[in-house]
A protein has these predicted regions:
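Membrane-interface interhelical connector segments
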Residues: 29-46
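Extended, low-polarity transmembrane helix blocks
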Residues: 1-29, 46-54, 58-134
């Protein structure tokens, strides 16, 4: 294994975790009415919207500290997939004015979390590289 692998895992975990946590903290401070409306438009109960806090506060926090990292990453993958389905499905094949994919942020969060789920936390984590909670 390359001596920089664990540093790369840490950097990826911190990047995905911190950036997504910022979105969750914004929703915590400003409310989730728009998400509740999206959920109810699907005919689902409004309480499902509170799951955003699991996907954007709890799971990113797990990535940041490196405990239950793979589970937290899979929660983020599910959360982002649901966000694309509920709020962005009409943009899946859309490009921006500058030629980028309209869902590049969601795609980066989803795929970055999937990579974390596959690789684990690494040794720079509370769970340790071979810990049961990695």
């Amino acid at each position: 294994m390359n001596r920089f692998d664990d540093a790369g895992k840490l950097l990826l975990r911190l990047t995905i975790g911190i950036l997504l946590l910022m979105h969750g903290l914004f929703k915590l401070a400003n409310g989730i009415e728009s998400i509740t409306a999206l959920v109810q438009a699907q005919g689902w109960p409004a309480w499902i919207a509170f799951g955003v806090f699991i996907g954007e506060i709890i799971a990113p926090s797990l990535l940041i500290i490196g405990v239950l990292t793979r589970a937290g990453a899979l929660v983020i993958v599910f959360n982002m997939g649901l966000a694309v389905y509920l709020a962005h499905s009409s943009q899946i094949l859309t490009l921006t004015k500058t030629g980028g994919w309209a869902l590049e942020l969601q795609g980066l969060f989803l795929m970055g979390a999937l990579v974390v789920a596959l690789l684990g936390a690494g040794r720079f984590s509370l769970g340790g590289s071979h810990g049961r909670m990695n």
